[in-house]
Amino acid sequence: MAKAFIGVGSNIDREENIRAALKALCKSFSAVVASKVYESSSVGFEGDNFFNLVVGIETELSPRELQDRLHEIEADYGRSRGGPRYVSRTLDLDLLLYGDMVVDEEDLQIPREDVTRFAFVLRPLSELAGDDCHPVSGKSYAKMWQEFADEEQKLWPVNFNLLSQAD
């Protein structure tokens, strides 16, 4: 079994879609754990605020199979691919990490660059895997969050536990 981390986000019917995503992830994978949920402004476009969190899972799927399964879940909840990258989303499920694997292919990058670029990914990841180390930099995610320097990316914790409501 491999430990993987998935970034989860939505800015369309956020609560409903995040809950649905968590239900689908709990049905598909074992040892599902979730970070706190954060609200953040959209990045790269003008749009409604997002809810974001990171989910840890254990899986026997390969990274490619896992990415394909995440795309299936997104499609089940109205996500269409092939359009502009920065747009409002019903559901966004991104494979962030897969064990300590490093993959750099056209349509699959592990670790996902978002881990080092966006507060809405790094902060919740540091909650779940703070002592784990980035497979390229070797720094712990807690240390990376402590050193994160982008003051423009504001996050607000959402005051409820979505995982318990997803069961």
Indicate residue ranges for each PLM-predicted region.
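Flexible, gly/pro- and Lys/Arg-enriched active-site loops
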Residues: 44-50, 64-67, 72-167
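Extreme N-terminal starter segment of soluble prokaryotic enzymes
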Residues: 1-5
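Short N-terminal binding/cap micro-motifs at the start of the first secondary-structure element
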Residues: 13-16
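Short, surface-exposed acidic-centric catalytic microdomains
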Residues: 20-66
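Short beta-strand-to-loop capping motifs
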Residues: 8-10, 55-61, 97-100
